[in-house]
């Protein structure tokens, strides 16, 4: 392939147009531009080669490895159409043509590129050579499209936990690594949430879920651990703040056609009687903002059974419809299809949690002594809870508790 063709095919990407915004691919395009300019000045060419290699070497020394990963993770309209079973013949032909070119590009070396440009590569002999290898990109990409329901595409292939910014999901690079195996106690409660999540992943009807209970009982940890546990099965978690509830309908529209399954997670949810966010959540749970997408469920945690902060002012106000208003607010929790209660642990459950955590953290202390000290610690910390148990065990591990 001549240099002009290399450059034209690279700049003429349509399906994989987004690759040109990749910093490494952009530097490669700048290098082919410099070579095609046929400028005999060596310094600008050295600069272009060095800039590309510096960008590539920050990730890997192998162009084929980098480019193949970038191709497989790029979100394209073809993969979206294929996931919906609507890939047209025109798009399929364009996809296969570009994959064939990108496969050749994976095997491109500096010497091959210089030869295509009819340049004397001895002038650049002092520069390092990147590695290259051709892969069967067409087969790999077709497999990725078939697995889109579990592995996803675009940012959803790289990350499984997200927050919301300006109405868009934004990846969390370092999510909480919480594991279900690290959460002793509350197995019956947790299994209800897990079963509902499995139904969501299977494409079966799944409920919106309210995890209610005392602070520190593991409600939020349960949701985060489930997201980690089932990420490989196609589950993604988007955390929505209470002041962002009005953005959920737009998020649902964005995600409805995605082959992955999504939990939109609202942590520590509660409302006051004049809270505008109440109406937004009510509309979402009732489905009055559009049909419920089968691949999305709303999970929320709250320390309040009815999700409402009641004050003396609320009860003695002059609103003629005060009772009806309060009843409507208190009935919001009933609109969740599944409510799971996490109660503060009694002494026996607290002891069982402590024993399991002590094993996980390799605490070498007689259990009787451990329980006595933990009970005293819990009294100072405001009462028994899994969070208090974990804090105590971590202090034992660090040597603070002896």
Where would I find each of the regions flagged by the language model?
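AAA+ P-loop ATPase mechanoenzymes
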Residues: 1-184
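Walker A/P-loop
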Residues: 208-238, 251-256
